[in-house]
């Protein structure tokens, strides 16, 4: 099975401008993401950006770069433009790996592509990992996902879902029981789906939560979630996250 990885990267991040180029262990963060994608065994890895600074840095460490519009509201929109520009076929599998996920395991990238290949009835495959810390559950920067019994996504939110009506009032003594999952910012989809996604209007929930994947659920699409077997540390959204990732390396 062949798949390609596109890494959407922008400089003007709302919460942490310039984070794609922040130094982590002697390399820009985007390079760590790129190297994980290369190790996954992808047929091709491309960085899609609208910023000349990111392009220059990426080309300096040997990456293929596709320049895109600065008008995109999400990584999926940026990837859709890049896939067309690169001439990818509708049935090809693309993994969208966010540029702020420097600790993503390469095997998780491949597993996601394989999962989509095995499920013809879904629009998208994505990744989640069990939440084991109470602070992470209540962290608004952490996106949570609720699954059904077959691991299809029911809803995504920055809020701590599902809400424990009888237990969440006592956070200090809260014991998590394995029913909460953090969404990891990586998706697999076929190129042909991207055109369909762009034809859909953004839904109210997507606008409220600022989560692009809610558009898929709103319009009746199915997202199959792979529960990661190896640890997937959170991505980078804050200065504290940068220090955490630096300590990891």
Curated annotation (Swiss-Prot):
Sorted alphabetically, which keywords does the UniProt record give?
A: Cytoplasm, Lipopolysaccharide biosynthesis, Nucleotidyltransferase, Transferase
| Major subcellular site | cytoplasm
Give the protein name, as stated in the record: 3-deoxy-manno-octulosonate cytidylyltransferase
Indicate the family of this protein. Answer: Belongs to the KdsB family.
Subcellular locations according to the entry = Cytoplasm
HAMAP family hit by this protein = KdsB (MF_00057)
Q: In which pathway does it act?
A: Nucleotide-sugar biosynthesis; CMP-3-deoxy-D-manno-octulosonate biosynthesis; CMP-3-deoxy-D-manno-octulosonate from 3-deoxy-D-manno-octulosonate and CTP: step 1/1; Bacterial outer membrane biogenesis; lipopolysaccharide biosynthesis
Citing just one GO molecular function, the answer is:
3-deoxy-manno-octulosonate cytidylyltransferase activity
Q: What does this protein do?
A: Activates KDO (a required 8-carbon sugar) for incorporation into bacterial lipopolysaccharide in Gram-negative bacteria.
**What is the top EC class of this enzyme, as a single word?**
transferase
**What reaction gets catalysed by this protein?**
3-deoxy-alpha-D-manno-oct-2-ulosonate + CTP = CMP-3-deoxy-beta-D-manno-octulosonate + diphosphate
What Pfam families does the record point to? CTP_transf_3
